[in-house]
């Protein structure tokens, strides 16, 4: 299977060879990354609308990741349900003179999850593989489940460097983690050229990256058994219309949803697709 670039053309530089394998059962995982959207009042309204439906969807781990200002309000609304709450970022230090930052201990008061290394953090705020790794280790220390993002830019994709970049980000971001705790980590593959553009990768090509790059790197880090237990999400313009196609792939274990998570009907439909 040839890797396709963002324009959908065959990329001769890199070829992913399909391999036969038996999928280990992993609970599907759907997280909504609201990014810098919704006031506290708007967050309450959105959760009130979609929370009732989401609570009725079983066999899927469902997580909401609103902006920091809305974490407490959303926590109060979803308390006692099976909905999880996640932060969109955090610092690796416990406390100190880090103006504008939030520590893992502060996040732990309300959240169970935290997104780390999102492409927008890497692009706009200088996030590196090293800082992602520091944050991951700090998150684990505080009992938070990290959702670690990896993915290539448009230029890297068109240059045939997808495997190189994604493998490096996976190996460097997750180094120093012991195999016993690695299975709790969630990895999200987000091709940067597909985020917010409406140009999702094909399900087949996303599967090839999940299987032949991300999970292969996880096997090198932690061994085959642990690697098979780690969930790998797809995050790149996932919608209600294309979610089922992605979720049908053996190594796509859910989605990190951006814009569609701000629309109750869309996010509910995506969660339902994951439950099938």
What is each PLM-predicted segment?
Residues 18-276:
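Active-site loop-to-helix "anion-binding N-cap" substructures in soluble metabolic enzymes
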């Amino acid at each position: 299977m040839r890797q396709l670039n963002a324009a959908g053309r065959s990329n001769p530089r890199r070829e992913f060879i399909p391999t036969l394998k038996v999928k280990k059962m992993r609970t599907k995982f759907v997280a909504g990354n609201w990014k810098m959207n919704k006031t506290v009042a708007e967050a309450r309204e959105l959760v009130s609308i979609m929370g009732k439906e989401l609570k009725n969807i079983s066999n899927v781990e469902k997580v909401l990741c609103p902006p920091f200002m809305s974490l407490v309000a959303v926590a109060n609304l979803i308390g006692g349900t099976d909905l999880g709450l996640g932060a969109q970022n955090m610092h690796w230090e416990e406390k100190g003179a880090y103006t504008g930052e939030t520590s893992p201990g502060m996040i732990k008061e309300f959240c169970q999850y935290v997104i780390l290394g999102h492409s927008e953090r890497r692009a706009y705020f200088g996030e590196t593989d090293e800082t992602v790794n520091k944050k991951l280790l700090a998150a684990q220390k505080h009992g938070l489940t990290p959702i670690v993002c990896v993915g290539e830019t448009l230029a890297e994709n068109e240059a045939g460097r997808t495997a190189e970049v994604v493998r490096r980000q996976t190996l460097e971001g997750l180094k120093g983690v012991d195999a016993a705790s690695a299975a709790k980590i969630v990895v999200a593959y987000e091709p940067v050229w597909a985020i917010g553009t409406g140009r999702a990768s094909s399900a087949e090509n996303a599967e090839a990256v999940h299987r032949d790059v991300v999970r292969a790197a996880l096997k090198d880090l932690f061994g085959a058994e642990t690697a098979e237990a780690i969930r790998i999400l797809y995050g790149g313009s996932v919608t209600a219309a294309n979610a089922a196609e992605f979720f049908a792939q053996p190594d796509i274990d859910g989605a990190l949803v951006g814009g569609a998570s701000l629309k109750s009907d869309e996010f509910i439909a995506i969660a339902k697709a994951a439950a099938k």
